[in-house]
């Protein structure tokens, strides 16, 4: 289904290190696809990208599969899961936007995170409260559109579910999810 690009500017050693899994799953009733399983290699590359502000490696995560992903999601509006604004300002880029802009699909960063919280540092119960800290800035832009929610790592699903709840209020034609990686942890169950 997917092929390897050979004419890219990313180190071939780094590309070989990435082992795509193409994990299909559901978030509620919505189809989702994760390209990689979240493992030590992905964790290390994400740290280099986000933590060390290495924007030059933004393309490494998706470059091998751009053609196929563009075909799969043609006509979708890409809505990235947000970072806290101040974190983006320190980094001088939004890592999710930079990671997915290689797809050259319409990007609509309409979600904002209103408080600096790191999901990884929170308990499962606290993670479910993420909806208190996400807002949608424009409800009309997504009405009747095919929406692709994108993120770097899908762990428990709390953030994605909160984003879906906001996007559903816009009455989109369709919602799908694409994440660069998925943690092997189970999703939080609806209570």
PLM regions with names:
Residues 2-6, 19:
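Short functional micro-motifs and their immediate structural scaffolds
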Residues 10-77, 84-93, 101, 112-141, ...:
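Active-site-facing substrate-recognition patch
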Residues 67, 98-105, 161, 165, ...:
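Short, well-ordered alpha-helices that flank and scaffold nucleotide-derived cofactor binding pockets
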Residues 80, 109, 149, 177-179:
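Structural beta-sheet core signal
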Residues 105-109, 191:
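Active-site regions of enzymes building and remodeling cell-envelope glycoconjugates
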Residues 106-107, 146, 173-176:
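Residues at the starts of beta-strands that form the adenosine-phosphate
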Residues 149-163:
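A phosphate-binding catalytic loop at a beta-strand-loop-alpha-helix junction
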Residues 162-191:
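PRPP-dependent phosphoribosyltransferase catalytic core
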């Amino acid at each position: 289904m997917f092929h390897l690009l050979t004419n890219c500017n990313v180190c071939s050693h780094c590309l070989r290190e990435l082992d795509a899994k193409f994990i299909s799953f559901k978030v509620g009733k919505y189809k989702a696809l994760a390209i990689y399983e979240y493992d030590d290699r992905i964790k290390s590359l994400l740290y280099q990208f986000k933590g060390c502000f290495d924007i030059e490696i933004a393309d490494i995560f998706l470059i091998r599969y751009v053609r196929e992903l563009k075909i799969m999601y043609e006509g979708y509006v890409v809505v990235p899961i947000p970072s806290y604004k101040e974190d983006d300002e320190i980094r001088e880029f939004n890592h999710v936007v930079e990671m997915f802009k290689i797809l050259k699909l319409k990007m609509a960063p309409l979600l904002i995170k209103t408080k600096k919280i790191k999901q990884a540092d929170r308990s499962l119960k606290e993670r479910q409260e993420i909806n208190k800290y996400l807002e949608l800035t424009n409800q009309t832009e997504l009405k009747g559109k095919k929406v692709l929610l994108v993120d770097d790592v899908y762990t428990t699903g709390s953030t994605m579910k909160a984003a879906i709840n906001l996007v559903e209020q816009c009455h989109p034609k369709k919602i799908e999810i694409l994440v660069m990686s998925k943690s092997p942890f189970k999703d939080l169950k609806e209570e």
